[in-house]
């Protein structure tokens, strides 16, 4: 058995030189991610697909990594056979997959893709195999529109590929095939999804964060940033730039009229991000703005916001509805994290005008002391996103006891997602384990026995630490972290 990686269709239509360039970058990205996760595999490059050969026990884990790498359209977990005839194909299917059991009492269809020279067509193979299966397996029927079971095959010359399972990938382009960008991220639904969309298009997306709410704001936003990096772009080193905007906010609220604050604040952010982008030779910015979503995002106001920068500003969500954005956030996994991030910009600018003018904005900004803005940018700090847990989250969270050796009275709360719990179950001898995904923990923790000590468990300890922080803020002290000894 092996994994076949099908390239994004947009890669396959490139010229030969560009196609080879993109594939080489994709292979490098795959190898980097496998190495980071202490996995090894052989990658064989073909013209229109890649083959991954690895230990049989690692297939599921490696597939889970590959489906989140930009540039991969889908994965096929396949068995490969040589064949001589259609009867040979039929026997290979029945012998290798026990379809007598899988198809019994169900509707099915056969789908075949074929390339090479043969004396039969793809449709003839489908028809032949369908007939043979119906003749030899009782109580089954063909359904070409909504089958309960679909048998996928690919034929290349005299090779037969039986597709055991198909996994959908991200599509798009491999990271590194496009230029670097700087995302103005607030941690909310919009900026997180906008960042993901440009990552998917092959951009190395760095993050610029304007801290409006202190340490807790930083921690909440860093959860989102680290999640995006860890899931979709850990093949690259990504910068996190944090700018303390508290003094800028004070200056704006003291000097700018209420109805102009929204646009002026956004202009100050774009100015600051442009200075940061110049420092790191980044040519484009990303925002999560949506046309007409709030008063500062009307066409006339966006034009005024753009005018303070020479950089291209990408707004991939410009025509999206909020419902569609949240659906995409849910799909990529940022929805739950973004829910906990307050919208500080909206709190600061509640009465923004929907249509201001250049003259009015410039008149208001004449009252603003730009040394405050320049000082904020000059005092910004930069770290590698992969160091966020150690350099930001752990430093801003009070010390919490971490246990490696458990007592028989301890109760472990497995706070991983249900999918993670199923893929890699936690087994502990004589220890009570409760499965409560982190997104349900806040609501369910108050229902637990307050006289017991609970230890939170996740794969890397990051989510456990964050959840302990939230629980302590709500007054719960009977909670610690469980990190099993390596």
Curated annotation (Swiss-Prot):
It comes from Blochmanniella pennsylvanica (strain BPEN). It holds the Pfam family Rhodanese. Its main location: cytoplasm. Residues 60-166 form the THUMP domain. The active site is at residue 458. Gene3D superfamilies: 3.30.2130.30, HUPs, Rhodanese-like domain. NCBIfam families: ThiI_C_thiazole (TIGR04271), tRNA uracil 4-sulfurtransferase ThiI (TIGR00342). Its EC number is 2.8.1.4. PANTHER family: TRNA SULFURTRANSFERASE. One of its GO terms (cellular component) is cytosol. The keyword tRNA-binding applies. This is tRNA sulfurtransferase. It catalyses: [ThiI sulfur-carrier protein]-S-sulfanyl-L-cysteine + a uridine in tRNA + 2 reduced [2Fe-2S]-[ferredoxin] + ATP + H(+) = [ThiI sulfur-carrier protein]-L-cysteine + a 4-thiouridine in tRNA + 2 oxidized [2Fe-2S]-[ferredoxin] + AMP + diphosphate; [ThiS sulfur-carrier protein]-C-terminal Gly-Gly-AMP + S-sulfanyl-L-cysteinyl-[cysteine desulfurase] + AH2 = [ThiS sulfur-carrier protein]-C-terminal-Gly-aminoethanethioate + L-cysteinyl-[cysteine desulfurase] + A + AMP + 2 H(+). The keyword Transferase applies. Residues 406-484 form the Rhodanese domain. Catalyzes the ATP-dependent transfer of a sulfur to tRNA to produce 4-thiouridine in position 8 of tRNAs, which functions as a near-UV photosensor. Also catalyzes the transfer of sulfur to the sulfur carrier protein ThiS, forming ThiS-thiocarboxylate. This is a step in the synthesis of thiazole, in the thiamine biosynthesis pathway. The sulfur is donated as persulfide by IscS.
